[in-house]
Regions:
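Intrinsically disordered, low-complexity Ser/Thr- and acidic-rich flexible linkers and loops
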Residues: 337-341
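Gly/Ser-centered flexible loop/linker motifs
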Residues: 459-463, 604
């Protein structure tokens, strides 16, 4: 029996408010006179150079025009490693919220037991964390005022539940100053978060929780929402919709597609089977034309022991060496079945064997996987029995095949980066620089092939994928996929996707010293901004592992333009809208005040009012994509810290 079921009876009443109403929001049934709607709260992050950034999210409180302050999710506290949210968002809650118009949100983060690590010469190193005064950090409060044209409105209705997404994003780059000159490094935190009713990214949303029920006929299943590694709190419930032809399921080590996967899920035990769905959010209408709701459509689902179970623990990380059936993992996270997690700065070990079940996430083409399918360079999530021997090395034995201790390994899509050396039909050679942001120098590829693997001529099987137009030898490329089986190289890697600089999400970041600047822009119009980097202490564009120094000789600061959102459906909220924000520390210690805008012109108009001598610009962080040929950075979000 899964511990989430054992502890179910101990959940607080506040965490279970109106579960029936929440289900109605997903299925567009009646909710009559509850006086509540739904706020689907998601968490994401804008990345920075951290190997871990673990803090507690203590609370999220909305301020309504009528009801005043209302805390979502009751007293539930979630421990979050925000570095794991660079490619996905997590559904934090599907909370019942009183009908009202909400104009702001207040998020409380607790740094008392924070685990924040940075990379020092390829080694994850735990940092000393301080606030702006140099003192140890405890709780920090971020108050965000919504765009006045896009407030969070839960409307009273008798036809169907009103439901709105609230997308929270933690900008790690704008929130932190890292001093690498100290030993260990020092991280000064001034948390910067945004909140909006439309996300400023198109990331998939992970929805985790124990199964309530499933229906092949309806094409859906329903879960209690338990984000991250939570085993106690149920933060509402949600119905997830399946594509009968394309949704990929991996359940107890077996892969299914579409309705067959839902039928297999139907055979599992409600309440004890843990699931995690990777979904796309789709705003939708209701029976009342004035009220909107939404759907979460799954592309990939994990369930049962493939995801987690009562008997085993998990270990996630990058395989940097393999000796026989012993894997060495760098930057690993231990996931205990109590709900606790632990980031490991030191290398950890996973033991494999013929009984280890191996699967590949969101993949139906890799067949015949076994314990020899795991090789150096692969990102994995393993399940097995955890121990901490006298050596002090975190060890996970995933070699067993018993019913109460089934070892398993999930192969997770891994990203290579480096200049292209050459290419031909079905193949490419890469001058490999990093794997999942780790420098190639930390990998010991011994055993991956009969001959030595050479990073400077790393062989990639591209299959039917074409090298993008305009890519020549020396051009940087980003390749996603999995490593080839242990001992089989070359090729060294099987590619699932090949991307170039112009299509990979990046970050433009400009920092000034503690005195800041009152003139951060050389141009500032309703169509674009150009940052004056001449007096900046640092100015870079980071695209994955690539760094472009904007202060280097001959560099020209790019024009930053807002991303144009795709055309939406009339009468429905947008699933994606760019977001632009400005904010600073207030006179109240540990409190940041931020104002968000979906309108770029409104944001630009506000900048000269906010950036003055008393509150100069300290950091500017834009997320988006960079076009080197036009020297243009197209921003889905811009955060200004002053």
């Amino acid at each position: 029996m899964h511990p989430s079921f054992i502890r179910y009876a101990r959940q607080s009443l506040s965490a279970l408010l109106c579960a029936g109403a929440i289900f109605a929001a997903g299925c567009h049934s009646n909710n009559y006179t509850s006086g509540y709607g739904i706020a689907w709260v998601t968490l994401s992050e804008t990345p920075a150079e951290f190997t871990s950034y673990t803090v507690n999210v203590d609370s999220v409180t909305l301020t309504g025009k009528t009801v005043g302050a209302y805390t979502i999710g009751g007293t539930a506290v979630e421990t979050v490693d925000f570095t794991k949210l660079d490619k996905i968002s997590e559904l934090w809650s599907a909370a019942s919220v009183p009908n009202d118009t909400y104009t702001s949100a207040s998020i409380v983060l607790d740094y008392t037991s924070a685990n924040i690590s940075v990379m020092v010469n390829g080694v994850p190193t735990k940092a000393t964390v301080v606030d702006s005064t140099g003192a140890a950090v405890t709780t920090q409060t971020i108050n965000v005022t919504f765009d006045p044209t896009n407030t969070l409105t839960i409307q009273p209705t008798y036809a169907s539940s009103s439901a709105v997404r609230l997308a929270l994003n933690f900008d790690l780059a704008a929130s932190s100053v890292v001093n690498m000159a100290t030993s260990p490094p020092t991280v000064t935190v001034k948390p910067f978060m945004t909140a909006a009713t439309s996300a400023s990214d198109t990331k998939q949303i992970r929805v985790r929780g124990p199964l309530i029920n499933s229906s092949v006929g309806v094409g859906s299943y329903t879960v209690y929402v338990r984000p991250f590694y939570d085993e106690i709190n149920s933060l509402g419930s949600l119905t997830i919709f399946n594509d009968p032809n394309t949704t990929v399921y991996t359940i107890y080590g077996t892969t299914y597609v579409g309705s067959a996967g839902l039928a297999a899920l139907l055979q599992t035990s409600a309440g004890t089977t843990m699931t995690a769905a990777y979904t796309n959010y789709q705003p939708s209408g209701t029976l009342n034309a004035a009220v909107t709701a939404g759907k979460f459509n799954s592309t990939f689902v994990l369930a049962g022991s493939t995801l987690e179970d009562y008997y085993t623990q998990g270990l996630e990380g990058d395989v940097t060496a393999r000796n026989g059936n012993t894997l060495t993992l760098t930057g690993s996270t231990l996931q205990l079945n109590s709900g606790a997690s632990q980031y490991n700065d030191a290398p950890a070990v996973v033991l494999l064997g013929p009984g280890t079940i191996v699967t590949a996430d969101d993949n139906t083409t890799l067949t015949g996987l076994n314990y020899n399918s795991v090789s150096v360079g692969q990102h994995i999530i393993a399940r097995g029995i955890y121990s901490l021997p006298a050596s002090g090395v975190v060890t996970l034995d995933a070699s067993s095949s018993t019913s109460t201790n089934q070892g398993s390994v999930r192969l997770v899509s891994t990203q290579l980066w480096g200049p292209l050396v050459s290419s031909a039909s079905g193949s490419a050679v890469l001058n490999l620089q990093t794997i999942d942001h780790w420098p190639v120098s930390i990998y010991n590829f011994a055993g991956n092939g009969a001959a030595a693997v050479t990073p400077a001529s790393y062989a990639v099987n591209t299959g039917s994928l074409a090298i993008p137009a305009g890519v020549a030898a020396g051009s940087p490329v980003w390749i996603d996929g999995v490593t080839t089986p242990f001992g089989s190289a070359p090729p060294d890697f099987n590619a699932f996707a090949i991307n170039t600089e112009v299509s990979v999400p990046g970050r433009l970041q400009v920092d000034w010293s503690s005195t800041g600047t009152t003139a951060p822009f050389t141009t500032s119009t309703a169509t674009g901004l150009t940052v004056d980097v001449s007096a900046a202490s640092a100015a870079v564009i980071r695209i994955g592992s690539e760094t472009i120094d904007l202060k280097a000789a001959g560099s020209v600061s790019p024009l930053i333009v807002p991303q144009t959102p795709p055309a939406g459906t009339a009468g429905l909220p947008a699933a994606f809208l760019p977001l632009f924000a400005i904010g600073n520390l207030t006179a109240t210690a540990g409190t940041t005040a931020i104002t968000a805008y979906n309108s770029f012109s409104a944001f630009v108009t506000q900048l000269p009012t906010s950036i003055v001598a008393a509150t100069p610009a300290l950091h500017i962080v834009a997320a988006g994509t960079y076009n080197r040929s036009t020297n243009t950075f197209t921003a889905s979000s811009i955060d200004v810290v002053n």
